[in-house]
Amino acid sequence: MEKLTILLLVAAVLTSTQALIQGGADERQKAKINFLSRSDRECRGYNAPCSAGAPCCSWWTCSTQTSRCF
């Protein structure tokens, strides 16, 4: 039982040490998520107003008559 307790303590110390060393990885992960989700916000969905500065998503077309995505 005593060996198990020591083993668990060593595992906890190693895990926390690894978390401290990899502390900057969270920021890189957030930047990657922001980059990937940014493209979703730049295009417009169905029936949304569209223009050259605010294009429709690739599966929609901007109507020249209504300036809306369809």
Curated annotation (Swiss-Prot):
Disulfide bonds join C43-C57, C50-C62, C56-C69. Expressed by the venom duct. Its main location: secreted. Coiled coil: none annotated. It comes from the Eukaryota. Residues 1-19 form the signal peptide. GO terms for cellular component: extracellular region. It holds the Pfam family Conotoxin. Residues 20-40 form a propeptide. GO terms for molecular function: ion channel inhibitor activity; toxin activity. Keywords: Disulfide bond, Ion channel impairing toxin, Knottin, Secreted, Signal, Toxin. It is found in: Secreted. The presence of a 'disulfide through disulfide knot' structurally defines this protein as a knottin. Belongs to the conotoxin O2 superfamily. Inhibits voltage-gated ion channels. This is Conotoxin Vc6.10. It comes from Conus victoriae. The lineage of its organism: Eukaryota, Metazoa, Spiralia, Lophotrochozoa, Mollusca.
